[in-house]
From Swiss-Prot:
It catalyses: alpha,alpha-trehalose 6-phosphate + H2O = alpha,alpha-trehalose + phosphate. This is Probable trehalose-phosphate phosphatase 5. One of its GO terms (biological process) is trehalose biosynthetic process. Its EC number is 3.1.3.12. The lineage of its organism: Eukaryota, Viridiplantae, Streptophyta, Embryophyta, Tracheophyta. Disulfide bonds: none annotated. It comes from Oryza sativa subsp. japonica (Rice). Belongs to the trehalose phosphatase family.
Length: 349
């Protein structure tokens, strides 16, 4: 275990000079770290089944023979490295939604985030610019998250809404909204292909089609395994009439998207530029995600040579990310730790 109260105490000790304040910080830090260690030990077990939401607790990811540490070390155990990288830098936090902020569930309409996770994201956004980058439509993600303090990029980054707030918290914040939709010309086509996919999958029990505005998701999580190939066949048959669209795979989902040079990595770069936070020397972007599409963002951060990609996965796998977390139960811990550390750094001495 590399997370230690002493590490955090030494860092905050450099910031505070008042004996009373430092003593209080030490006490709070010990309590927080002790609590986090307990949560980490609990979260090391497999997720418990959630009957109401339809989550069965099992992983649908491919396992490998390698241990987790041989592929990506735990972001919690190596939190000191993350904080060391963030010293004297502006942290920007990017988060996937499904499988990261919420559990993967059988019914996509029931992928609710916990109240604890929502409160954590809301709190961390007070200290760091925070964005959610999801394959879902932007409106649908907002309906799940319900936070106005953060930025949203839906449709795998093809629908970005950035609201820039005044930094003076003592006055009412005024916002300048920037909407970016690089696949806008495909909107009518996506609507058409969505209708076609709904029609051809009607006969396949368990298959569902989700129109995410600039992309379409065909979910086969509830389809009998013997019919998975059939799902792929009907999707490919429909796409024969739409040569400018492509299909990619996710976690028991087929994603139909425009064939343009845009992905979650491009969305991250766009948001960093829009926020005027694209200086790799002074900014540390952190991206947390669980899906194959998040690898594009991990790759961008790796190529910047000053970013931190964190893969969410219950099983070890090769990734462009630097660290791993094992599910939403661990994801919720990292922002808490970042948030607490940031709060200490900005307290007056």
């Amino acid at each position: 275990m590399k997370i230690s109260a002493n590490f955090l105490l030494n860092n905050c000790a450099r910031t505070y000079t008042k004996k009373k304040t430092l003593k209080k910080c030490k006490r709070e830090l010990v309590e927080v770290v002790d609590g986090l260690v307990g949560v980490m030990m609990t979260s090391s077990n497999r997720e418990k089944p959630d009957i109401e939401s339809g989550y069965d607790g099992s992983s649908d990811e491919d396992s490998t023979e390698n241990s987790r540490a041989e592929i990506c070390p735990s972001a919690l155990c190596f939190f000191d490295q993350i904080v060391a990288s963030a010293q004297d830098k502006k942290v920007v936090l990017f988060l996937d939604y499904d499988g990261t902020l919420s559990p993967i569930v059988n019914d996509p309409e029931k992928a609710f985030m916990s109240s604890e996770m929502r409160a954590t994201v809301k709190s961390v956004a007070k200290h760091f610019p925070t964005a959610i980058v999801s394959g879902r439509s932007r409106d649908k993600v907002f309906d799940f998250v319900k936070l106005t303090e953060i930025y949203y990029a839906g449709s795998h980054g093809m629908d970005i809404l950035a609201s820039f707030a005044d930094s003076d918290s003592t006055i009412e914040k005024t916002k300048e909204t920037k909407l970016f939709q690089p696949a806008n010309e495909f909107l009518t086509m996506i609507t058409e292909v969505s209708k076609s996919l709904i029609e051809v999958t009607k006969a396949i029990k368990g298959a569902t089609v989700e129109n995410n505005k600039f992309c379409v998701s065909v979910h086969y999580r509830n389809v009998d395994k013997k019919n998975w190939k059939l799902v792929a066949q009907v999707v490919n048959n429909v796409l024969k009439d739409f040569p400018s669209l492509k299909v990619s795979t996710g976690r028991k989902v087929l994603e139909v998207r425009p064939m343009i040079n845009w992905d979650k990595g491009k969305a991250v770069e766009f948001l960093l530029r829009s926020l005027e936070l694209d200086d790799s020397e002074t900014v540390l972007p952190i991206y947390i995600g669980d899906d194959k599409t998040d690898e594009d963002a991990f790759k961008v951060l790796r190529e910047r040579k000053n970013g931190c990609g964190i893969l969410v996965s219950q099983v070890p796998k090769k990734s462009e990310a630097f660290f791993m977390l094992r599910g939403p139960s661990e994801v919720v811990i990292l922002p808490v730790m970042l948030n607490f550390f940031a709060a200490l750094l900005i307290m007056p001495s």
